[in-house]
Amino acid sequence: MKTECRELFAMTVILDIEGTVCPITFVKDTLFPYFLEQLHPILSSLQFPLDKADPVANICSQFPSHVQQDETSLITYIRQLVASDTKDPVLKSLQGLVWKKGYDNGDLVAPIYDDAIALITTSSEPIYIYSSGSVAAQKLLFSHVKGNLDLTPHLAGYFDITTSGHKQDSTSYKSILHAIGNPEPATVTFYSDSPAEVRAAIEAGMKATIVVRPGNGPLTDQDRQLGTITSFP
């Protein structure tokens, strides 16, 4: 088993974030609440109709027109997206902008697992990130890691639902393979806490394994047959 793990990590690696390299609670209990707390202070400065010259207004102008009438409509709509965990690219862009403020002023620090830090900083093979969060938000997270670490110099690239598609669709993984130079799919391994994402990557020809961390969702016996790890060796 250890030999098999070493062989997997001697390959190009693509990592999910939430529940894979950092606790799922960081996103649900820290990032999402912080975003919601900052909504009113940020949106209260907007002028309606929205002035696209303003970065926040420019993002909000991409939401459906019927929610752009006033601050209350915008906040209600955005809160609904967050509550339903909708993978909306416009929402992800706005979250990234808000989280940047939090990371920059020290309110937010990413609790990346120690074993994930070790993998990212010592791997001789390329490591990429694929998350539903925007590429901008991914870069913020990995550049503001506990211990005052910046892991971005060790990462080869980033992908999100805007660049590559949704994570439960096998064509998204084929798109990533094309973007990283069309390596043989079986030489690339994807790690995620989501069985559906792992299945999609396998369908695209990649190797893929489920990462089991504290707080992650339960797995069925069928899920476990896909292969699991509890940490990166």
Swiss-Prot record:
Where does this protein hold Mg(2+)?
16, 18, 193
What's the catalysed reaction? 5-methylsulfanyl-2,3-dioxopentyl phosphate + H2O = 1,2-dihydroxy-5-(methylsulfanyl)pent-1-en-3-one + phosphate
Q: Which keywords does the record carry?
A: Amino-acid biosynthesis, Cytoplasm, Hydrolase, Magnesium, Metal-binding, Methionine biosynthesis, Nucleus
User: EC number(s) for this protein?
Assistant: 3.1.3.77
Oligomeric state and interaction partners are given as: Monomer.
Q: What is this protein called?
A: Enolase-phosphatase E1
Q: What is the annotated role of this protein in its UniProt record? A: Bifunctional enzyme that catalyzes the enolization of 2,3-diketo-5-methylthiopentyl-1-phosphate (DK-MTP-1-P) into the intermediate 2-hydroxy-3-keto-5-methylthiopentenyl-1-phosphate (HK-MTPenyl-1-P), which is then dephosphorylated to form the acireductone 1,2-dihydroxy-3-keto-5-methylthiopentene (DHK-MTPene).
Q: Which residues form a coiled coil?
A: none
What InterPro entries does this protein map onto? Answer: Enolase-ppase_E1, ENOPH1_eukaryotes, HAD-like_sf, HAD_sf
Under SUPFAM superfamilies, the record lists: HAD-like
UniProt family annotation: Belongs to the HAD-like hydrolase superfamily. MasA/MtnC family.
Report the superkingdom from the record: Eukaryota
The protein's location, in the record's own words, is: Cytoplasm; Nucleus
Gene Ontology BP annotations: L-methionine salvage from methylthioadenosine
Show which residues constitute the signal peptide.
Answer: none
**Note accompanying the cofactor annotation:** Binds 1 Mg(2+) ion per subunit.
Pathway(s): Amino-acid biosynthesis; L-methionine biosynthesis via salvage pathway; L-methionine from S-methyl-5-thio-alpha-D-ribose 1-phosphate: step 3/6; Amino-acid biosynthesis; L-methionine biosynthesis via salvage pathway; L-methionine from S-methyl-5-thio-alpha-D-ribose 1-phosphate: step 4/6
Gene encoding this polypeptide? UTR4
* Gene Ontology molecular function: any one: magnesium ion binding
Gene3D superfamilies per UniProt: 1.10.720.60, HAD superfamily/HAD-like
Cellular component GO terms, alphabetically?
Answer: cytoplasm; nucleus
**From which source organism is this entry?**
Meyerozyma guilliermondii (strain ATCC 6260 / CBS 566 / DSM 6381 / JCM 1539 / NBRC 10279 / NRRL Y-324)
What's the cofactor?
Mg(2+)
Protein residues bound to substrate: 131-132, 167
